[in-house]
Amino acid sequence: MVFRALYLMAIVFVVDGHTTLGDMFTLDGLFKYYSFHLMLFAFGAGYFFRMRGSLASDILSRAKRLLLPLYGWNLVYGIGAAVLRRFGGFEIGVPLSAYTLLLAPIVDGEHFVWNLGSWFIFPLFCVQVIYSCIRRAAKIWKDNEIITFIVSLIPGVIAVSLCSAGGDEPMLPLFVMRPLILLPAYAGGMLYKNALEARDSMPTVPYLAIVVILRALLCVRVENLAYLLSNCTYFVCGPFGVYAGAALSIAFFLRIARLLAPHVAKSRLALSISRNTFAIMMHHYMGFFALNCVFLVMNMLGIWAGDFSVRSFRTQAHYNYAPGGHAEFNVLYLIAGLLFPLAVAFVTDRLKVLFRRITKKRPVAAPSSG
């Protein structure tokens, strides 16, 4: 249940980070989302890593679970974006093509905008495959967890160094850099599970105090710990800043998750959010769009939202309406970004059940012996 709470916080950080303010839970900037939130996801996923048979069957299993939904929703959003551009006057997203349908989900992932968060799915798939290969090779060093983590850390350090050297342009393709940068955090999940969790017994108050002090000192030492993993840019903090910052953030929120776990276990909504992180990552921008549609209708009816910008709605992918300039309304986008994907997940789950019932074959009657 601790990791349910951890996933809950991680996905809330992701959605909040995509709103206009994007800093509701950063502790006044001490834990900036873009310095750790995707590492937090990778860490949680790594904690639950397990090999699934042979390497080939392992890859196929992960592709079925991650890539098939990715491509399916990419098609849905591509068609939806085309319809909105053709009939709704929108200027967001790129046209349908073989590239946007087949290659863009893995080399970019931000092309149709309304499913922008889906770029993370292919790197996560690659991380799982790479780490599976490393675990199979770990027999060479007798499955020593420290060595396994170091082997996973080295590619990440190299990738971050290349990002830092490249400035505003990554020196290697995004589909190579993204998973390599995430790999140490994913490996850290298994390191924690197999070597550190049993020793994680320090009392909470001194534990959190030490982590906060170290994080504050790191923030003073490093100019900016935040970076843009989606584009592999703004890595001014270098490998040490990236991974030390991620480790301290994970340590902090892992202990917070332990405190929240009993309460999360009693909340159906919290559990639902933590169990549907794929759907929320995929659809939260559409949740923002749905809320903007509500404001648009209110504006057209003259009920409220008189300063809602229809032009910005149609041309700006990140447009969040602030009624009367009150940015506090940003929380509505956070709520919409969490609840709308849950509704999508609920509907798709019901459709899957219905499809299975329709396609389920009835047992063939045995031939009569007479």
Language-model segments: what does each one mean?
Residues 1-370:
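Alpha-helical transmembrane segments and their immediate juxtamembrane cytosolic regions
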